[in-house]
Amino acid sequence: MSTPIIVMGAGGRMGSTICRLVQEEPQLCLAAVLERPDRASGVARDGCIAGSDPDVVFPQVPGGVIIDFTAPEASMATARAAARHGNAVVIGTTGFNEEQKAELAELARQIRLFWAPNMSVGVNVLLKVLPELVRLLGEKYDLEMVELHHNRKKDSPSGTALRLAECLAEARDWNLPDVACYHREGIIGERPQKEIGVQTIRGGDVVGVHTVYCLGPGERIEVTHQAHSRETFAQGALRAAAWLATQKPGKLYNMADIF
């Protein structure tokens, strides 16, 4: 039996990509699409429910898995509505503050809830191998990162960059807020050894590029992940949705739980 999928923001770039790919997966079916009231009629598709109110649509798809790549406040509203109606949720939105992350963790005790700032296979493999690389190199190597995205991205640094920076900090038993440097200007003196630089570039239509630099005496290692298409993230979300449908509530799941 196929898993019914509910797509939030179905008229957006990610939402429309997800809708298209769901229809190509035999184990999934597109059950409902949601958009803002002024755009809801434009996302209607044959054989699935279209609307704008989660409290109206979600109860019509019992057992449905919601996929949301919208914006922090909208995704929080989605998660709360899912908790009211018992639906599972896959969230790929970035830019959550600490209070919102804590609320997601609390909601995950009631419903099946999955959140990952980046759902590409490559990035999540990178998160697995980076700690070992950092440990092997030792603390004489400075750690820096540059992330590049399209000019319409609203949050900075990207959620992926922050997760990669957390990964680097954890490998050295550092607390990221204590060592992160997001801006350098003027006479700032020598670079502290206990620091992780995270720099941001915005422009054009770049889907996403993240480069981690390990800079040591006489050499450097650069590790780069480039996303060439939003399908990378959409495919990861579909994989997460199919997996989440078989899980139970109790924790805030992420890509590490799948790999």
UniProtKB/Swiss-Prot annotation:
Catalytic site: 149, 153
Locations listed in the record: Cytoplasm
Pathway annotation: Amino-acid biosynthesis; L-lysine biosynthesis via DAP pathway; (S)-tetrahydrodipicolinate from L-aspartate: step 4/4
Annotated residues for binding of (S)-2,3,4,5-tetrahydrodipicolinate: 150, 159-160
Gene Ontology CC: one annotated term: cytoplasm
Residues that, per the record, bind NAD(+): 9-14, 35, 92-94, 116-119
GO molecular function terms attached to this record: 4-hydroxy-tetrahydrodipicolinate reductase; NAD binding; NADP binding; oxidoreductase activity, acting on CH or CH2 groups, NAD or NADP as acceptor
Disulfide links within the chain: none
EC supergroup of this enzyme: oxidoreductase
Pfam families for this protein: DapB_C, DapB_N
Amino acids binding NADP(+): 36
EC number: 1.17.1.8
The keyword Cell inner membrane appears for this protein: no
Coarse class of the protein's main subcellular location: cytoplasm
GO BP, one annotated term: lysine biosynthetic process via diaminopimelate
Keyword set, alphabetical order: Amino-acid biosynthesis, Cytoplasm, Diaminopimelate biosynthesis, Lysine biosynthesis, NAD, NADP, Oxidoreductase
Catalytic activity: (S)-2,3,4,5-tetrahydrodipicolinate + NAD(+) + H2O = (2S,4S)-4-hydroxy-2,3,4,5-tetrahydrodipicolinate + NADH + H(+); (S)-2,3,4,5-tetrahydrodipicolinate + NADP(+) + H2O = (2S,4S)-4-hydroxy-2,3,4,5-tetrahydrodipicolinate + NADPH + H(+)
Record-stated family: Belongs to the DapB family.
Function according to Swiss-Prot or TrEMBL: Catalyzes the conversion of 4-hydroxy-tetrahydrodipicolinate (HTPA) to tetrahydrodipicolinate.
Protein name (record): 4-hydroxy-tetrahydrodipicolinate reductase
Lineage: Bacteria, Pseudomonadati, Thermodesulfobacteriota, Desulfovibrionia, Desulfovibrionales
